[in-house]
UniProtKB/Swiss-Prot annotation:
One GO term describing the cellular component: chloroplast thylakoid membrane
Descriptive protein name: ATP synthase subunit b, chloroplastic
Membrane topology of this protein: Single-pass membrane protein
Organism: Ranunculus macranthus
Gene Ontology MF: a single term: proton-transporting ATP synthase activity, rotational mechanism
């Protein structure tokens, strides 16, 4: 047990390295130096810190202003784009409507043109048929007339003899002579 008590005794002889408690010696603790340093830091640091904070504030405000300007520009561009989109949609609807009406108009024109062509072809066909009928009728008439003439000549040639022929010629000469006297 002697060893334990010796160790406590030896603790009492060590020099004091520092202890908890307040040191009331002003020069030993340097509160004047600390207060001067703190005062200088506060006095000069306040301006520097204020300048740093003002610069930071100005950068933040300019960033906000720039952001607002960009936002305003973006909103303006968006409105322009929306207006242009509405305009393009209206033009597309107009083109679509005009396109449909143009298609309908062309369709009607094509139908009318086709009917006119068909009517013209029908008239041409009817004229051709009438012409061919008239030509056939004329050919038939000509043949009938030729056959009638041939038949009449055949009848006359078979019926006429020289004496009848001479009498007919004399009668015709007499008629020409009478006509000559009248004129």
């Amino acid at each position: 047990m002697k060893k334990v008590t010796d160790s406590f005794v030896s603790l009492g002889h060590w020099p004091s390295a520092g202890s908890f408690g307040f040191n009331t010696d002003i020069l030993a603790t340097n509160p004047i130096n600390l207060s001067v340093v703190l005062g200088v830091l506060i006095f000069f640091g306040k301006g520097v810190l204020s300048d740093l904070l003002d610069n930071r504030k100005q950068r933040i405000l300019s960033t906000i202003r720039n952001s607002e300007e960009l936002r305003g520009g973006a909103i303006e561009k968006l409105e322009k784009a929306k207006a242009r989109l509405r305009k393009v949609k209206a033009e597309a609807d107009e083109f679509r409507t005009n396109g449909y009406s143009e298609i309908e108009r062309e369709k009607c024109n094509l139908i009318n043109s086709t009917y006119q062509n068909l009517e013209r072809l029908e008239n041409y066909k009817n004229e051709t048929i009438q012409f061919e009928q008239q030509r056939a009728i004329n050919q038939v008439r000509q043949r009938i007339f030729q056959q009638a003439l041939q038949g009449a000549l055949g009848t006359l040639n078979s019926c006429l003899n020289n004496e009848l022929h001479l009498r007919t010629i004399s009668a015709n000469i007499g008629m020409f002579g009478a006509m000559k006297e009248i004129t």
